[in-house]
């Protein structure tokens, strides 16, 4: 039976002592994953800039002066060259992003070819192309696309302060089409947009209460880019960021949690705490679309220090709800059993 989360349950989690939250998250993580293994993906911008949307965090919006170099859709040869390099570096998934509001019909055949050719390299494929209309999700799935990324970004109530060119329901509708098509969902959010705790809670509830939780959940720390409306936004507290990673793991125990944008500005200790809290995937490479990312040598050094091994093979996940007694422990705050991931 799938856990149905509500605000009170999640708020109670956030109210617990920091180390209690991490302890529970690590136990749940070990129940479902090899805690010393990390999945590597590579993200390539296949069409950059001139996006008509007004997402306040995004340097690719045509509405902001961010000095982003506008690039037209890459050729198949260019994409495959990057995919081959990604595989050589250890990535098991190749993600492709296009700065569109939605894919145009004229590009669908090319996208189909790209998917099929990348898969021939033995890589999983993921695309983020904006809102999907009509039968586009079905056609991408038929072409062999494994994952479709479409982030919710933040809570429904805060969303309108960040994006006005597409609605929250538009995003949810796209996720429904993706799930119905048979593709796996990659969907998460951005922390540090100026949201409150309640917004983080509502975002996690929205994700976890989808018909099936996303198989992949990217958690981003806002990268403040000069020229965007959020360039001077106050940074999220590091402990609040780590705590949110941990509670994401508790709420969605079998999903891969990707520590995504913002790692370039995180020290090794912060990243290590995120991995301890249940993050088990990263993007490999010096750039995420248009924002900086740690160089592979730096990541390799960190993995070596932490004893983390790169996951080379894809395995089927066990989506059963947890029932191990080790996930139950006593909260001194309430003098009663604090949490049972099976019965919540």
Swiss-Prot record:
Organism of provenance: Buchnera aphidicola subsp. Baizongia pistaciae (strain Bp)
Pathway info: Cofactor biosynthesis; biotin biosynthesis; biotin from 7,8-diaminononanoate: step 2/2
Record key words, sorted: 2Fe-2S, 4Fe-4S, Biotin biosynthesis, Iron, Iron-sulfur, Metal-binding, S-adenosyl-L-methionine, Transferase
Domain Radical SAM core: from-to ranges: 36-260
Flavoprotein found in the keyword field: no
Family matches, as InterPro entries: Aldolase_TIM, BATS_dom, Biotin_synth/BioAB, Biotin_synthase, Elp3/MiaA/NifB-like_rSAM, rSAM
HAMAP family registered for this protein in UniProt: BioB
Secretion signal span: none
Lineage: Bacteria, Pseudomonadati, Pseudomonadota, Gammaproteobacteria, Enterobacterales
GO biological process: biotin biosynthetic process
Reactions the enzyme catalyzes: (4R,5S)-dethiobiotin + (sulfur carrier)-SH + 2 reduced [2Fe-2S]-[ferredoxin] + 2 S-adenosyl-L-methionine = (sulfur carrier)-H + biotin + 2 5'-deoxyadenosine + 2 L-methionine + 2 oxidized [2Fe-2S]-[ferredoxin]
Gene (name only): bioB
Protein name: Biotin synthase
Subunit structure: Homodimer.
């Amino acid at each position: 039976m799938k856990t149905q989360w509500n605000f009170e349950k999640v708020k109670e989690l956030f109210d617990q002592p920091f180390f209690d939250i991490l302890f529970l998250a690590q136990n749940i993580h070990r129940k479902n994953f090899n805690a010393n293994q990390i999945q590597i993906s590579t993200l390539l911008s296949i069409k950059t800039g001139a996006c008509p949307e007004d997402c306040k965090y995004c340097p690719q919006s045509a509405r902001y002066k961010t000095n982003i170099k506008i690039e037209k859709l890459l050729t198949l040869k260019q994409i495959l060259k990057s995919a081959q390099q990604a595989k050589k570096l250890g990535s098991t998934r190749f993600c492709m992003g296009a700065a569109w509001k939605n894919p145009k019909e004229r590009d669908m055949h090319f996208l189909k070819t790209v998917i099929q050719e990348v898969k021939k390299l033995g890589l999983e494929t993921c695309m983020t192309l904006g809102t999907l209309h009509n039968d586009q999700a079905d056609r991408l799935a038929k072409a062999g696309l494994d994952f479709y990324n479409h982030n919710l970004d933040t809570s429904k109530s805060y969303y309108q302060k960040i994006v006005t060119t597409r609605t929250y329901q538009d995003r949810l509708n796209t996720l429904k089409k993706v799930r119905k098509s048979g593709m796996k969902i990659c969907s998460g959010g951005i922390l540090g947009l100026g949201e409150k705790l309640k917004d983080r809670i509502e975002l996690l509830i929205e994700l976890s209460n989808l018909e099936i939780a996303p198989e992949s959940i990217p958690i981003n720390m806002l990268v403040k880019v000069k020229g965007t409306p959020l360039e001077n936004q106050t940074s999220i507290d590091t402990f609040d960021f780590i705590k949110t990673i941990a509670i994401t793991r508790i709420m969605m125990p079998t999903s891969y949690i990707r520590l995504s944008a913002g790692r370039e500005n995180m020290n090794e200790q912060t990243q290590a705490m995120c991995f301890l809290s249940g993050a088990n995937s990263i993007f490999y490479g010096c750039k995420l679309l248009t924002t900086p990312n740690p160089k592979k040598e730096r990541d390799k050094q960190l993995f070596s220090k932490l004893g983390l091994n790169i996951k080379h093979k894809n395995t089927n996940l066990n989506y059963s709800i947890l029932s191990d007694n080790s996930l139950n422990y006593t909260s001194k705050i309430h003098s009663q059993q604090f949490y049972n991931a099976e019965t919540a």
